[in-house]
């Protein structure tokens, strides 16, 4: 039986809000998360809210004798490295949306970078991250930018790590009050091809934010 592929809106919100806490969090396992080394990205199968389970602001932690467990995901933390709890049950339904998966990985990468460098980027975090996730305006703008700039042919020529680093530079540059890049951020756009892509991303991201 042929599956009907869901067409996603390019510049509209794609979420349906859950009442209270999300009850079905799916752990994303795909080549994209494997390449990025991100094994603790979760997405609600209903509203597509992202949860980066890293024992920080958005986790609901329960202390046990062995360590901490995040009640949202069932991840068990012994120190700082997450591992699956034996009682963790994952929903069997996976969102059949490749683009959503890619954007979730990109957003999680940018989120992780900002949190890990929060002393430098505290003003940006304050403005665009609320309750442990990006505000809806930023999420939608990233989705629009990805759809406009990155086609299959472009993605095949660029590692996902490079695309993620371009989004880091895009979001920092788009929301910083001044120039606060460090060398690790701007290094990715020093090559001509990546610099040209970043210029297109800035145009599309700015247009999406203005909607």
UniProtKB/Swiss-Prot annotation:
It comes from the Viruses. InterPro entries: Herpes_UL92. Belongs to the herpesviridae UL92 family. This is Protein U63. It comes from Human herpesvirus 7 (strain JI) (HHV-7).
